Amino acid sequence: MGGQVRVAIVGAGGRMGRTLIEAAYHQEHILLGAAIERAGSSLVGIDAGELAGVGKLNVIIMDSLDYATDDFDVLIDFTAPDASIVHLDWCVRHKKAMVIGTTGFNQAQKIQINAFAEQTPVVMAPNMSVGVNLMWKLLELAAEVMGDYTDIEIIEGHHRHKKDAPSGTALKMGEVIAKTLGRDLEKCAVYGREGITGERDRETIGFATIRAGDLVGEHTAMFADIGERLEITHKASSRMTFANGAMRAARWVVEQKPGLYDMQQVLGLN
């Protein structure tokens, strides 16, 4: 896309929201059009750029998207499942594209998102990082070659404030591996182990979760056999990698027809 894409960021005062504001500031083809916080927040009325540490941007944090209807083309949302559904409904009614980085949606909410996406273009991904999306492609290859005869474990770690577990990225890793092997993740996933569990079933995919300190995000898939194991690992050291991916998705999604897309499509990996 040749011109600038105007973005609005909801949850602007959170850790990820501030990083998104900073990312928008540094990208030539992105213009921050609006920044939104919840009603009653002490941050309402503050300049978004000053909040994010990039200097004054003359974009004042507001408490409703209704005040910014004409100020943006794409809404970027890394908030919470219930809030993201409300924001997507708003985008459909106001003909705005949306980028969703929120994780933790239940099945009913995923069905809602699919229905809304029939009316407006939406990019939704549990992880916007280029490296993570490449990792998912590598997992397909590893599962094709080694998946049938190895024990598969997925280990993920995040900061102490993360609310959902396992992470959306870890679940996507499991889905990619299970699909490649012709398995149903809901039936073969094992989430943590305790007590006398008996011998491991090779058809299962194990998940282990770490929540500690300020870990940004670490994910490892292990394919373990007798005598050797393959580990595919991605480590994020800054939230900026997710924010930059979201900006890339925003530039891409404004040119798409209504539909539900993922970062694999944004990056041309599928």
Swiss-Prot record:
Pathway given in the UniProt record: Amino-acid biosynthesis; L-lysine biosynthesis via DAP pathway; (S)-tetrahydrodipicolinate from L-aspartate: step 4/4
Top EC class for this record: oxidoreductase
Binding positions for NADP(+) per the UniProt entry: R38
GO terms for cellular component: cytosol
Catalytic reactions on record: (S)-2,3,4,5-tetrahydrodipicolinate + NAD(+) + H2O = (2S,4S)-4-hydroxy-2,3,4,5-tetrahydrodipicolinate + NADH + H(+); (S)-2,3,4,5-tetrahydrodipicolinate + NADP(+) + H2O = (2S,4S)-4-hydroxy-2,3,4,5-tetrahydrodipicolinate + NADPH + H(+)
Localization, UniProt: Cytoplasm
A single MF term (Gene Ontology): oxidoreductase activity, acting on CH or CH2 groups, NAD or NADP as acceptor
InterPro entries for this protein: DapB_C (IPR022663), DapB_N (IPR000846), DapB_N_CS (IPR022664), DHDPR_bac (IPR023940), NAD(P)-bd_dom_sf (IPR036291)
Gene Ontology biological process terms from the UniProt entry: diaminopimelate biosynthetic process; lysine biosynthetic process via diaminopimelate
Similarity annotation: Belongs to the DapB family.
Name by which UniProt lists this protein: 4-hydroxy-tetrahydrodipicolinate reductase
Native source species: Shewanella sp. (strain W3-18-1)
Lineage start: Bacteria, Pseudomonadati, Pseudomonadota, Gammaproteobacteria, Alteromonadales
